Amino acid sequence: MAMPAALLAASLLVGTVGVASAQEVGGNRPREVNVEVLVEAPEEDPKRKSDPIPPLAMPVSDAASLARVPADVIERDGLQLVLDRKHHQLLVLRDGRMTRRYPAAVGTTGWETPAGRFRVFEKVKEPVWTHPVSGDLVDAESEGNPLGSRWIGFYRDCNGRSGWDGEQYLDINGCTVAGFHGTPYRWTVGRAVSHGCVRLYEENVQEVFDLVRLGTQVTVLP
């Protein structure tokens, strides 16, 4: 089964959210998540077919999940997030103990969620999504909003990206942002299908949103 074009489009647009600065926006006021990129589809090879939908990650135990976390991360006090790209899951650690574990959708091949150590720099409730091509604003309640009800930004890069995404060739000129967010496509959670962002079930991203603060450390394991 090939990856649906609509799904890929949504994952690209999620992966190209631009955020200006560290901030937290709550209450009932929608927050527009701005886009700062130009997306172009170069001439494609008509003979190349869409890639199959990536499979769900194999389940692992709590012990196996913690075994992948570096010792210095385990030794840190306080709350922190650890994204395990290999097993498509998000771990919540507090004072070195794993308190929660969630399935997650991560970046697809060639568009992997950036590995490294970062910090949460923006939290948005009910984000308003800006279409990167038309400029249309899509409210959080709309079925056309791929961000879900929460946005937690932790990575920003302005070098641009390009390549095959499983469905088409894309060139992204400008800044891209990766973060945790909800998704209307529940079946994608647990798969490597995005362009870098991390999708969680709505009920899970709301829990994570309430747990973290601006500055919370995020470690992404390859």
Protein language model features and the residues they cover:
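N-terminal pre-domains immediately preceding structured catalytic cores
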Residues: 2-222
